[in-house]
Design a protein with these regions (language model features):
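N-terminal beta-strand motif that seeds the catalytic metal site of vicinal oxygen chelate
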Residues: 1-15, 97, 126-157, 164, ...
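Short charge-dense sequence patches
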Residues: 1, 20-34, 70, 111-117
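Conserved short beta-strand elements that form part of the metal-binding/catalytic scaffold
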Residues: 29-68, 118-123, 178, 191-197
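Short, structured interface segments
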Residues: 111-129
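Vicinal oxygen chelate
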Residues: 13-14, 66-114, 150-233
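A general structural signal for short secondary-structure boundary/capping elements
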Residues: 55-58, 109-117, 144
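Core segments of cupin and vicinal oxygen chelate
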Residues: 9-48, 158-175
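Short glycine-enriched loop/turn motifs at secondary-structure junctions
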Residues: 1-3, 58-63, 103
């Protein structure tokens, strides 16, 4: 039998933290408050443990990260979002706790628990080589879209993804293939909703609706818009 590594994350308000993981479908396997705080949960063969933060130390936000490799990241994200929607009345997308968005073909997502621990769920066969800046095999707005995807999905850097898309549309939008432009607008709609900017989202939707897209092209942007709809619900 091989070694088993168990991450120990910050516990915070332990009851609240364990309740959050119960909501996600984990089973609480240990809970102790005296003489010190310690708890543990387990789900799908994966254990997460929680200990007390060091006293007198101000912890940087989201400084503790755990990676969980799994076989079907899309199914897990769906299960988590449904559980969170049932518990909170909506899918929490900002602050603590929250879950990052998910689109068709995406290979990872992040759950940030009430304490600020980040648990990143990753498709086991995720490609090893990520070309930051966008794939060199692409050009123009297509490469901009790939760069924005990496910033958004791998670095959780929505602000930079927005800037990259806006600059890219300004530079390449006039000559870009119609579908690439529509995908860029759809991505910006989702990012505007995540940034709590409904006015910007409405403006972008108007621009997207004005585009004369084929049925196939409209179908291609539905995944991006579905992520936006999940945020708005």
């Amino acid at each position: 039998m091989g070694d088993t590594a168990v991450p120990v994350l910050w516990g915070g308000d332990l009851k609240n933290t364990l309740d959050f993981y119960r909501t996600l479908g984990y089973a609480v396997t240990y809970e102790q408050t005296r003489p010190y705080v310690y708890g543990a949960v387990e789900g799908n063969g994966c254990a997460l443990h929680f200990g007390a933060e060091p006293r007198g130390t101000e912890l940087p936000a989201e400084s503790v990260i755990c990676l969980v490799m799994l076989d079907d990241v899309a199914a897990r994200h769906h299960a988590f979002t449904e559980a969170l929607r049932t518990h909170y009345g909506k899918v929490p997308a900002k602050g603590y706790p929250r879950i990052t968005r998910f689109r068709p073909g995406q290979s990872r997502f992040t759950v940030v628990d009430p304490v600020g621990n980040s648990v990143i769920y990753i498709q086991r066969d995720e490609p090893k080589d990520i070309e930051y800046g966008g794939s060199r095999e692409l050009a123009g707005l297509a490469r901009v879209l790939d760069n924005a995807r990496i910033l958004r999905d791998f670095k959780n850097d929505d602000a930079t993804a927005i800037r990259v898309l806006e600059v890219g549309l300004g530079r390449f939008g006039a000559e870009a293939p119609r579908l690439d432009k529509a995908m860029a607008l759809a991505a910006l709609i989702e990012l505007a909703i995540a940034a709590d900017d409904p006015a910007r989202s409405d403006t972008l939707r108007t621009e997207l609706r004005a585009m004369r897209l084929t049925e196939a092209e409209r179908s291609a942007v539905e995944g991006e818009l579905r992520a936006a709809a999940d945020l708005a619900d």
